[in-house]
Structures are given as structure tokens and as C-alpha cells.
Amino acid sequence: MLEKDFNTIVTKSLNNQAGFGFKIPDERSTITGFHSKNPFDVFGVFDKHMVCWESKYLPKPQSFNFNHLQDHQIDNLIKIYELMGSDRCLSVFAVGVDFGRNDKRVFIWKNDQLYQIKERKANQQNILKKEFEGLTNYVKIKKGEIDMAEILEL
């Protein structure tokens, strides 16, 4: 699975669970040579919450380097959370990790937990493989979908 496939799962999950999801197309160069920057990967609506989602995917348990997360992406997620609050917003940074067989986990940091991610990025503190193995803030991909209601409860 690639990161784009992971984002397809997120979008499909939103659309199939009485919500709305849209994958923002990847950045492209314009005719004038300017590059657009996507604010994050997916947006949508679920259970009266605006959903803003940035995804990263690891094909196996390994360290996650925050160089893969752009400053503007985490800043945009935090800004939306600050403007809307957790009662109307689900701003998510997610790292999917394939643990093999039928064990594909989606580690979730949402809303006020995004400050921890921003701090770790600023301090260049990777999420280590061993740390992933001990985290409990995840949902599993089941039958090609993520249970969005389960994410709201995390």
C-alpha cells in the first residue's frame, strides 16, 4: 500500500459512513512555474464535524521522521482546530503502519493532541519503531475502511 492508497481508504471511509470526504489532489506546478501547497490531504464531514486529515504511511513498523510532515500541514490542522473547536472539528494527523497480515493500524493524533506533534517536529523527535508498538491511540483498517466513529471516541 502507498500513501495515496491510504488516503483513498480515508476518503472512502468518510463517504461510506454517512459523511463526505474529498482527497485534495497532490500539488502541481502551474503554467507560470508556481507550485501550489496543499493544506493537508483530505477534508470532509462526519457526524457534524468538519474533518481535516493529513496522512503518512509506513509499509512496516519503523521510525517515523517528522521531515515528512510539512510545517504548513500541521499549522493548518491546528489553525482549523483553534477556530472551530473540538465540538465542530476533527483535525487529524494520522500515521498508518502495516504490521503485517490483517494488522494495519492507523495511529491518530487529533485536535489538541496536534500540539504534541508540532513540538516533536520542532524538536526533531522521531516516533520510534518501539514507540509505535506501545501506542494505543490507533484504530485498525478493517475491510478496507477506518471506523470514523471510533476515531471520534479516541
Predicted regions and their residues:
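Nucleic-acid nuclease catalytic cores
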Residues: 78-116
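Acidic-basic catalytic patches of nuclease active cores, encompassing PD-(D/E)XK
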Residues: 1-36, 154
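Conserved catalytic cores of phosphodiester-cleaving nucleases, focusing on short active-site segments
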Residues: 42-44, 49-60
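Mg2+/Mn2+-dependent nuclease catalytic core
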Residues: 58-80
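N-terminal interaction modules that seed assembly of large macromolecular complexes
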Residues: 33-45
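Short, solvent-exposed loop/turn segments at secondary-structure junctions
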Residues: 30, 60-63, 101
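Acidic, Ser/Thr-rich peripheral helices and adjacent loops at domain boundaries
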Residues: 116-127
